[in-house]
From Swiss-Prot:
One of its GO terms (molecular function) is NADH dehydrogenase (ubiquinone) activity. Belongs to the complex I subunit 4 family. It comes from Cucumis sativus (Cucumber). Its main location: plastid. It is a multi-pass membrane protein. This is NAD(P)H-quinone oxidoreductase chain 4, chloroplastic. HAMAP family: NDH1_NuoM (MF_00491). Disulfide bonds: none annotated. InterPro entries: NADH_Q_OxRdtase_chain4, NADH_Q_OxRdtase_chainM/4, NADH_UbQ_OxRdtase, ND/Mrp_TM. The chain crosses the membrane at residues 4-24, 37-57, 87-107, 113-130, 134-154, 167-187, 207-227, 242-262, 272-292, 305-325, 330-350, 364-384, 386-406, 417-437, 463-483. It is found in: Plastid, Chloroplast thylakoid membrane. It is an enzyme of class 7 (translocase).
Amino acid sequence: MNYFPWLTTVVVFPIFAGLLLFFFPHRGNKVMRWYTICICVLELLLTTYAFCYHFELDDPLIQLMEDYKWIPFLDFYWRLGIDGLSIGPILLTGFITTLATLAAWPVTRDSRLFYFLMLAMYSGQIGSFSARDLLLFFIMWEFELIPVYLLLSMWGGKKRLYSATKFILYTAGGSIFLLMGVLGIGLYGSNEPTLNFETSANQSYPIALEILFYIGFLIAFAVKSPIIPLHTWLPDTHGEAHYSTCMLLAGILLKMGAYGLVRINMELLPHAHSIFSPWLIIVGIIQIIYAASTSSGQRNLKKRIAYSSVSHMGFIIIGIGSISDTGLNGAILQIISHGFIGAALFFLAGTSYDRIRLVYLDEMGGLAIPIPKIFTTFSILSMASLALPGMSGFVAELIVFFGIITSQKYLLMTKMVITLVMAIGIILTPIYLLSMLRQMFYGYKLFNAKNSYFFDSGPRELFVAISILIPVIGIGIYPDFVFSLSVDKVEAILSNYFAR
């Protein structure tokens, strides 16, 4: 039996280590960068060690459980634990945050605060993925918004305050519904609050009340995922934020919404999820086609990639709505896959902007010759995004397709229509991505312009791009690496489902 509080250490270490940044000398930018990167690497190694040596893959139950009475007066517990559903997002968080910190190397203004906020965000995200108490989940969910808001409002483009305000209004509005759902579930049927995930999972509710809870949680997670029509904060936010912040937003923040849908809506409220799943699939299909079509019309490079993120999140929603082993496994794989690909595309868009200082695609052109390394990595990762075989995106989308086809919930004709419409969405993806590559890298505009000498990727930027590319290709060739983490937990969720 392992008694060391691994998860508490992993959750609190980044923020407490980040507080030490404020005691560093004022002119120590380089020292602060290296310190932050070392903290992120150490945290990732610590997490990996704990999972490798203390986590059993074939056990679908919660592992590394920690349960401490935190505030006795409110009967509030510090409950942490992981299972096959949360281990993937936690490792993804560690990996992307470490690379985002390395990507933020050029940030010199208020770098002490910048790196502290990144580490605070790291703690909040791991806390959200490992919380086993509804109120603790809500606190971590909210805590993580503060550093995101400050990162958006202090570093970025000219309209950064507008986009940060829009982000906080949307997410705070969604959080009201989340809090109401948490309190409703916690206080239902007893005088004392029962906020434990395990107790709540075994609780049954009147169907009307369960639907109300489901809608509340769905709105909160739809804002974060984002699900249309609550997605409009995302393009503005990505368009203005610094690219290291965009990596965290696209790589981890959006995945928290999808994780919440599975962890709370699907696991705790199965009857309501069974009723709403056809609507989730309809919304997912509309989202894939709408966001892909809208992306094609975007002049702004980062907004085009942001809409592609919205489109790819549609596959996750369809996988969750399919109520099948294959579909849910595909959704979890897409969460991991898009975490890597989305972060990589925003990083490469940011490094391109650092050189040419242009965001509008119709002003670019001919960049392939002066910056061939960026061109090569951008092209390969765009292919991963449009689901080229051999890349993680292809496997994830294909398995979501199989999930819909093999689902027992829907009639054959319905499944054929869903598959056909999804296929149309997949055809639209290469249109906006290949068009983006053509406008940026081909042609003659910038190559023939005066003073058109640009530095290509340095070792740091190449390291970040290749570090993301390796798992994208690795998962594409051997997806069982991700499935081995989640498959038992998915079976447990769905067996509980059909048993009811």
